[in-house]
Amino acid sequence: MARDTAILRVTGFVQGVGFRYTTKHVAYKYDISGTVKNLDDGSVEIHAIAEEENLNKFIDAIKKGPSPGCRIEHVYIYKGAPVEERKTFDIVY
């Protein structure tokens, strides 16, 4: 099956609340490979690769806020964006 890609930019109260750590666990649940990293503007960027159904479930979970301490304002989604192929999902520092 073909794997789809997406870049997500998540804004709100998403840094310093375990957002990247819990995003990594959600990624494992849905067999997502890619990365998650904090950006200097206070947002978080996620690069994700997975089969379409799993990618959509992952995006829905991110929209709900994977971390209990986070507050999502908006999730910008760029489906089909070029993403580096990876075998794992990693937190980038």
UniProtKB/Swiss-Prot annotation:
Alphabetical list of InterPro entries matching this protein: Acylphosphatase, Acylphosphatase-like_dom, Acylphosphatase-like_dom_sf, Acylphosphatase_CS
Keyword DNA damage among UniProt keywords:
no
Q: Where is the Acylphosphatase-like domain?
A: 5-93
Answer whether the UniProt record assigns the keyword Hydrolase to this protein: yes
Question: Which Pfam families would you find in this protein's record?
Answer: Acylphosphatase
Which reaction(s) does the protein catalyse, per the Swiss-Prot or TrEMBL entry? an acyl phosphate + H2O = a carboxylate + phosphate + H(+)
Active site annotated at which positions?
Answer: R20, N38
What keywords would UniProt list here? Answer: Hydrolase
Q: Tell me which EC number(s) this protein carries.
A: 3.6.1.7
UniProt GO MF annotations: acylphosphatase activity
- Name the NCBIfam families for this protein: PRK14443.1 (NF011015)
What's the family?
Belongs to the acylphosphatase family.
Alphabetical list of PANTHER family matching this protein: ACYLPHOSPHATASE
Instruction: Report the protein name in the record.
Output: Acylphosphatase
Q: Which gene encodes it?
A: acyP
